[in-house]
Amino acid sequence: TNGVPGKCTKPGGCSTYCRDTTGTMGLCKNSKCYCNKY
């Protein structure tokens, strides 16, 4: 999966994005947001 840029600039931005869009946990790697199922 491709990381989403711009979601890791704010604390919790990636987590909120992933939860709202896919219902998954968010992980920031290399300044990009990745959504992972748990």
Curated annotation (Swiss-Prot):
It is found in: Secreted. InterPro entries: Scorpion_toxin-like_sf (IPR036574). Expressed by the venom gland. GO terms for cellular component: extracellular region. Keywords: Disulfide bond, Ion channel impairing toxin, Neurotoxin, Potassium channel impairing toxin, Secreted, Toxin. Disulfide bonds join 8-28, 14-33, 18-35. One of its GO terms (molecular function) is toxin activity. A probable toxin that has no activity on the tested mammalian voltage-gated potassium channels (when tested at 1 uM) and is not toxic to mice. It resembles alpha toxins that block voltage-gated potassium channels. Negative results: no activity on the mammalian voltage-gated potassium channels Kv1.1/KCNA1, Kv1.2/KCNA2, Kv1.3/KCNA3, Kv1.4/KCNA4, Kv1.5/KCNA5 and Kv1.6/KCNA6. Is not toxic to mice when intracerebroventricular injected (when tested up to 37 ng/20 g). Has the structural arrangement of an alpha-helix connected to antiparallel beta-sheets by disulfide bonds (CS-alpha/beta). Belongs to the short scorpion toxin superfamily. Potassium channel inhibitor family. This is Toxin Bot33. It comes from Buthus occitanus tunetanus (Common European scorpion).
